[in-house]
Amino acid sequence: MPYLKGAPMNLQEMEKNSAKAVVLLKAMANERRLQILCMLLDNELSVGELSSRLELSQSALSQHLAWLRRDGLVNTRKEAQTVFYTLSSTEVKAMIELLHRLYCQANQ
């Protein structure tokens, strides 16, 4: 049930879903992981592409990607030796789209 202004929040629903929200918010609390999620919004990118766009070492990027994989926020697809990443769920996409509207489009 979505929260409507003036409507009481359903405490049981909130408790049930808050753990999933915390996982996503913790991942986004790190600037590099947030940047990775933003880059994956409408793109499937390889580790090499992410590394060059972020100007981040392969080992540092691997640690961030491992965090995102562990928490189920990204999907992977392997093609030969190349691993490609995409966002894993509509919730992740919706949150990144919201942040983009609030912080990126507002500045244009």
UniProtKB/Swiss-Prot annotation:
GO terms for molecular function: DNA binding; DNA-binding transcription factor activity. Residues 13-107 form the HTH arsR-type domain. CDD domains: HTH_ARSR. InterPro entries: ArsR-like_HTH, HTH_ArsR_DNA-bd_dom, HTH_MetalResp_TranReg, WH-like_DNA-bd_sf, WH_DNA-bd_sf. SMART domains: HTH_ARSR. Residues 47-66 bind DNA. GO terms for biological process: regulation of DNA-templated transcription. Keywords: Activator, DNA-binding, Transcription, Transcription regulation, Virulence. Up-regulates the expression of the hemolysin gene, hlyA, and may promote expression of other virulence determinants in vivo. It may have both positive and negative regulator activities. This is Transcriptional activator HlyU. It comes from Vibrio cholerae serotype O1 (strain ATCC 39315 / El Tor Inaba N16961). The gene is hlyU.
